[in-house]
Regions:
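Metallo-beta-lactamase
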Residues: 78-201
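Active-site neighborhood of phospho(di)ester-bond hydrolases with catalytic His/Asp-centered motifs
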Residues: 24-26, 48-56, 76-79, 139-142, ...
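Terminal amphipathic helices with adjacent charged low-complexity linkers/tails
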Residues: 196-213
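Active-site beta-strand termini and strand-to-loop segments that position acidic
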Residues: 16-19, 110-111, 133-135
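Short, glycine/acidic-enriched loop or turn micro-motifs at the edges of active sites
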Residues: 28-29, 58, 146, 198
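Active-site metal-binding motif and surrounding structural segment of the metallo-beta-lactamase
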Residues: 19, 30-77
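Short, small-residue-biased leader/transition segments that mark boundaries at the very start
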Residues: 2-6
């Protein structure tokens, strides 16, 4: 049931601390206060330079406007399709002078960390992109490689991830294959999805499962 899924779903957002600081995506509207508090704790008085928006589905993008109210000097990083959707979703959001439009393959240097943006259209929305941090060898995979379930519950990844894959991205198999081919060219040691746990070990297993499913 939808309510059961909702009760057992984790929404992830990440912060990269460097000479310039980047926040990766926001979270569902229901967790606005908790999320902003967590971001503030991690920033520890610093101001974020960038908000990277990989995916405009409401459970990840709902707090863009709230974030910009809290940190009005932040530059929003996204692709053209994402900014178009953002304008439709947030009629009162003024990002004049606060946009960084990226194309497929563009990079952004934060200091030691260099982020490269790889477009992944229809995994599972048309504007989706993923982000690769070549310094720490991290793939911020948007909805890819996510799973249902809470983070405080120990459970096998495959079962809930397969259910998630079938329900969320499975119908876009060709697009997933394109993403897997792109991922195969990268030295990935960590996968950070927008749902579920961070994946750090035996990454070939997860890539293989996505190929099979």
């Amino acid at each position: 049931a939808a309510s059961d899924v909702y009760k057992r779903q984790a929404y992830n957002s990440y912060v990269i601390l460097d000479e310039k600081t980047a926040v990766m995506d926001t979270v569902d509207a229901n967790f606005k206060d908790e999320w902003l508090e967590n971001v503030a704790k991690v920033l520890d008085g610093a101001k974020p330079d960038y908000l990277v928006v990989q995916h405009m589905e409401p459970d990840h993008a709902a707090n863009i406007e709230n974030f910009m109210k809290a940190y009005p000097d932040t530059t929003v990083v996204a692709n053209t399709k994402t900014f178009t959707m953002m304008g439709n979703f947030f009629r009162n959001l003024n990002l004049d002078g606060k946009k960084l439009v990226v194309a497929n393959g563009d990079s952004l240097t934060l200091g030691k960390h260099v982020l490269t943006f790889v477009f992944a259209p229809m995994v599972h929305w048309p504007e989706v992109m993923v982000t690769y941090d070549s310094t720490d060898k991290v793939l911020f995979s948007a909805d890819g490689f996510g799973k249902f379930g809470a983070l405080d519950v120990e459970e096998d990844w495959d079962c809930e991830a397969r259910r998630y894959y079938i329900g969320i991205v499975g119908k876009y198999g060709a697009q997933v294959q394109k993403l897997l081919k792109a991922a195969a060219t990268l030295d990935i040691q960590t996968i950070c999805p927008l749902h579920g746990p961070i994946l750090t070990e035996n990454l070939g297993h997860y890539l293989e499962k996505y190929d099979i499913w």
